[in-house]
Amino acid sequence: MPIHLIAIDIDGTLLDSSYCLPEANRKAVVEAVRRGIEVALVTGRRFDFAKPIAAQLGCPLTMIVNNGALVKTADGVTRLRHLLDRETARFVLQSTPRFRNGTAVVFDRQRDNQVIYEHIDWEDPLRKGYL
């Protein structure tokens, strides 16, 4: 059975622990695309985080970002956008503050090129480098 799609997580899979793209991984992705296999980079992070990584690969890719809420091509064309509506987001934020201690709540306004976050503990090792 032929392979049609390879979906690759970025952090710790495509990139190494220093957030660098190993040459062997770059070559493998380029070879897969050359063979006609669609490659998708997948991350819970923002499109702006994934875009430079896609540029390093230098081949046409799909990017699944924002924990799957947004699917874009490497050049920024939106294929799918499924975000929380304003009312639901407001309800979640108002209902859960005691459960979100130290958790980042990010509002990503790409058209305005701004990121607004409620609180991020920058000393937490899981948060460093996230945005």
Label every model-predicted segment.
Residues 17-18, 50-52, 74-75, 115:
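Short glycine-/acidic-enriched loop or helix-start segments at secondary-structure transitions
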Residues 4, 18-35:
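Basic, amphipathic juxtamembrane/active-site segments
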